[in-house]
Structures are given as C-alpha cells and as structure tokens.
Amino acid sequence: MNILITGADGFVGKNLKEYLENNKENIIFSPTLEELDLTDSDSAKNYFNNNNIEYVIHSATTESKNKIYPKDVCEKNLKMFCNILKYKDKDTYLINLGSGSEYSRPNWIPQMKEEYFDKYIPQDGHSYSKYLISKIINLSKDKTLINLRIFGIFGKFEDYTNKYISNCIAKNLIGLPIKINQNVIYDYLYIKDFCKIVEHFIKNKPVNNTMNVTPTDSIDLISINDYIQLTLKIKPKIDIIKEGYGREYTGDNTILLKNLRNYKFTPIKESIDELISYYKENMGLIDRDKLLEDNFLEYAKKIN
C-alpha cells in the first residue's frame, strides 16, 4: 500500500510513520516541506502527479508556538486540505485528522456525539479550519474521505513542555513540583491505539465517514498525576490554582466502536507505564529550563 503521511515530522505523524513502516507491504511517503508544500498548489499538483498514492493520512497542520497559532492558521490549513482534495486521484483515500475542537470549546458538553457537530461554530482560526474541513467531508458524501475526530492524545514524541501527561512524567522524574490551573476530565487516547485504528481503516472501509476517536474511559488530571507519582514512588502532591472542574473534554465513541468491531483500548495505566519507561530510557530529552518556564500552565490559565 502506498501511503502518504503529511506532517510526518510531528508527534502523531512520526508515530504513524514508525508504526505503518513495520508492515513491509506498505510504502510510506513522508516528504519534507521542500519536497511537498501543501499550501502551494503547484507543489501539490506536481507531487501527486509524480507519485502513485493510494492513501493520504493528513496529519499536517500549521505549526503553533507555545499553543499559539499564527493569524493565518485558518487560511493555511484550508489550503493544505483543498490542495490534497483537488490533486489526489479520485480513488485515493484521504484520512483527515480532525479535532474535538470542531465542537467549539466554549460549548463543549460531556460525551459529545457526532450529531452535536455544527450546533456551534468555533471562534478561533485553528478550530474553525478543522470545522470547515469536517463540514466539507460531511457534505461531500464521498466514500474516499474519512474524518477522524481526535480529542486528547498522548505518547512518545509529543512535546513534553505543553502536553499534560508527558509534562507530568518529565517533571516528576527530575523532581519539579506539579501545578495545574484546574482539574479537568479528558478523553486521553494512547498513540499506539490511534495507530492501530488508522491501520484498521486502511484495511477496512468505514461505514461512517466522520467519527469521534476517543477511548471508552475518561480520566481527570489529578488522577493522572496521582498514578504517575504512585508508580515512581513519589509522595503524592499537586498544587491546584482553581477549585472544582474545568470544562470537560470528552466524546462519545459509539460510532467508532461499531466501525472497529469490538476494539479493546489499552488501559490508561498500562499506557502511562509505557510512557514512563520511554522517558526513563531517554532522560537526555528532558530540558529542566524549558519545564521551569511552564508554558503549559500559562496556556491552561488562559483557556479555563
């Protein structure tokens, strides 16, 4: 299978590339920006004309800095998607990586179902672009277009300075205090599960073209840190700025499970154990000064 992964140098794309390459029947295309600039129509046209692509996994997005996207994020994200749509072969499947932010952050409710989509329109540029792409896929009725709506996702290769679970593990490993703005309940999907889900939809055509990609069990931020500290044999301690709970970020996965045929997710504790082992084996990746800046906490203060 000839598979193009856009954004293959990012957290999700890098994991997908590593996972799918294990199947020797797959030929993975992971071009650099110089080889393929999806915001440039000529670049996209030439790439698709010169390469036989059977599947596109679109994980590329406009890069953010400390969780802040540039002003033209919506324009760039739409250009990338539209250029893929225009220049891919009509029989080439496109698996687009969507986001729970399509439901509009200020209006999130627990266990959002797919039919909740379009009740509200997202206000920020990144979420709005994801919303519009999802809308295009839904309205197209094209069976080659698939939108996988991701909520929380974690695993190796993610940015430990602003991704909660890796941030928590890294700080605990080097003895830094854990401080959160407010407790929140999340759907955290392990990257290994996501890779298996994508592989399933390459091998098996989905019944639904858009679905939430979330685990069955949700978890709150305090419980995650408690488990990490218990595993590392650290006295449980976490500082919380605001009492109560922030806005829950969870989605209903009924449609996903119908398409996956009784898929069993990796238990959250098992996946955290694996990530702890990864950081223990790669302690050199952890930059104490970057963790002390605490960009993740500053971002959390702004959104909750």
Task: For each feature predicted by the language model, list its residue ranges.
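N-terminal Rossmann NAD(P)H-binding glycine-rich loop of SDR-like oxidoreductase domains
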Residues: 2-21
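Glycine-rich Rossmann NAD(P)(H)-binding loop
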Residues: 6, 153-157, 179-188, 210-219, ...
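NAD(P)H-binding glycine-rich loop region in Rossmannoid oxidoreductase-like domains
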Residues: 38-76
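NAD(P)-cofactor binding segment of oxidoreductase domains
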Residues: 54, 68-95
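Conserved Rossmann-fold NAD(P)-dependent oxidoreductase catalytic core, especially the SDR/UDP-sugar
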Residues: 82-123
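NAD(P)-dependent short-chain dehydrogenase/reductase
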Residues: 131, 135-186, 191-200, 227-231
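Mid/C-terminal beta-alpha module of Rossmann-like enzyme folds, strongest
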Residues: 168, 197, 204-244, 248, ...
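Amphipathic terminal alpha-helices
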Residues: 268-304
